Amino acid sequence: MSVLGFDIGNLNCYIGVARQGGIEVITNDYSLHATPACVSFGPKDRSMGVAARQAVTTNIKNTVINFKHLIGRKFSDPVAQRFIPFIPCKVVKLPNDDIGVQVSYLGEPHTFTPEQVLAALLTKLRTIVESQLSDVKKVSDCVLAVPSYFTDVQRRAVLSAIQYAGLNSLRIVNETTAIALAYGIYKQDLPEEDAKSRNVVFLDIGHSSTQASLVAFNRGKLQMVNTSYDLESGGIWFDALIREHFRKEFKTKYGIDAATSPRPWLRLLDECERVKKQMSANQTPIPLNIECFMEDKDVTGKMQRQEFEDLAAPIFNRIKQVLINLFADGVSIKPEEIDEIEIVGGSSRIPMIREIVKDLFGKEPKTTMNQDEAVARGAAMQCAILSPTFRVREFAIKDTQPYRIRLSWNSTGENGGENDVFSPRDEVPFSKLVSLLRSGPFNVEAHYAQPNVVPHNQVHIGSWKVNGARPGADGGNQKVKVKVRVNPDGIFTIASATMYEPRIVEEVPAEAMEVDGDAKTEAPAEPLEPVKKTKLVPVDLEVIESIPVSYDVQKFHNLELQMQESDAREKAKADAKNSLEEYVYEMRDKVSDQYAEFITPAAADEFRSVLTSTEDWLYDEGEDAERDVYEKRLSELKAVGTPVVERYRESETRKPAFDSFDQSIMRVRKAYEDYANGGPTYAHLDSKEMEKVINAIEDKKKWLDEARHKQETRSKTDAPVVFTEEILQNKNVFENVVNPILNKKKPAAPAPPKKEEPQPAAGDQPQSQPGEMDVD
């Protein structure tokens, strides 16, 4: 069973794997821990991860990046509109205000949803795991981390994408919770359960957003006290700020506007990210140089850290506000009660972040956790906790949900009502019962009660129709209990609805207990009459769910499978073409060099001609041939080349094999001569067995001499008459005969006879020792 945690960031993804020795973040096919969150669509296949990101400038119109905040959102959503300009391909509005990315795939226009793009990325991550871990045959179960501020509809969208990719989600864990788990589960010095908690603030400044969490730790448990976030502070916002600065500078200096062309605009963003990172490590001005940027113009600029900090002051203020918001009304812990502050996330390396933390808490922030991998490690640990194949020390997690959820209801001919069933910072997973009086079917709706604090324009969570309620015997209402729940994935649902109907039931009273003595004198008791009682009997009601966005999981899973099959076919074809190309280059060089002695000049000329024509074909008609065509041509070339390679390799290994066999025979012959001359080493051996030894010597020596002579008379361009493998087999047969005989141990020498002690003469009696006394 795979135990995996996926951290899907806006820029990069990380894969955490639980092993017996702990959590490991594995590398991808480019030996990097970070896999870019990038999917590129081409005329023949898809590419994801590093390969897609490296080719983004050459396939910019068909590449999807920075799409994390489009998942589960509508096209008109203000957050989606803020991130769409960072996506180089065309983003379109679909029916129902859904989002689509429009690309050219397999030579035809296609429109994919952000959830489909996420599924493609998850497919790539699964492929990485299966190729990098030999003990994992097929990846199925996983835990995926999402921002703590993701709403109900976004979480459902992520679950759908996981299903599109053919994976099974054990849990969706909040990124803030994953970080806290990665921190706390290994700590040996946490306070005891009944002692004052260790209060830790985690500040995660990622690529597209900033999250903070306040967590109370005790031995064996963590409690999420509060979380806060900001969607306009993070790495991409710093990069965009620097980019805008240079855009204006280049417009004035060179008369070009990078924002008018997608390719230079994206290229400038990448360069600004590099400048930002270098400014974090250097006080000196950092240069920015781009050749042939636009209109064949080279551009140069520079920026110093102080200038960047002045430009980014509004973003730094937003990050500070995120930390302040942790201590909102209702939070009992004060800033002065914070024991530690841990900073993670790629943008936490900016020096000003440390100053903000120090200014607010009066303490230096810590960086004891891996700033890039903390979320993936925590997600993998959560997966290990849920997995039956792992034994993990007990660690209780009390998580919270961030929004106020309100339930409203109605029924035909009756006034409805509403009630807040979950408040911000309520523990999850958790269930509550709402009691209603109903006489017929009714509808229940859930929505976020404070739209201004929810970062999503879809505040309606869902509707549920409850069927089966009916009037009581008196025609009045009956009690109905509706069970509402926020499940471990952070998704709200109505788990059940139960009507409690009064019914008359008969109960036989319990008989009085007999007491010894009385039973003999009293007459037999008459049977007791049943007593009629009214009881509330639970009746399960039908609940029909209707959520704002529905996903056709089977349809999109089948589409993903088709694309995976297409990718696999194209990869197999590319591998076959590469194998043919590599063979042509290798053999063309070696036939004129190290293989030259092992092929006749005429055959070599003909072979080189075929190799050259194959190379020409590869770059002409064979540029896009089928896999079996490449394999057939390679097979035809190997029919000529393999015997040449075989002759070369045999010439390299045959002589050492002959020499080794010769030495083995000489060693055994020397042992036999020692035996024949009466030497002590083999004197204990049986003559019949030693006859087997000398026969084996003569037989194999004869074979060896004949084989060597036959081979020496052959030309190097002829096929070998004896192969190295045959020599080694004969050597093994020989040694299996002689070694057991020669290695027999000498029998143990007989023990020396015991020396007999003289017996006393008859009549001699031993003298009694003084002090001894005979007693009758």
Swiss-Prot record:
Belongs to the heat shock protein 70 family. One of its GO terms (cellular component) is nucleus. GO terms for biological process: determination of adult lifespan; protein folding; response to topologically incorrect protein. Coiled coil: none annotated. The keyword Nucleotide-binding applies. The gene is hsp-110. Disruption phenotype: RNAi-mediated knockdown in a sod-1 mutant background results in increased aggregation of denatured proteins in neurons. Keywords: ATP-binding, Nucleotide-binding. Residues 741-776 are annotated as: Disordered. Pfam families: HSP70. This is Heat shock protein 110.
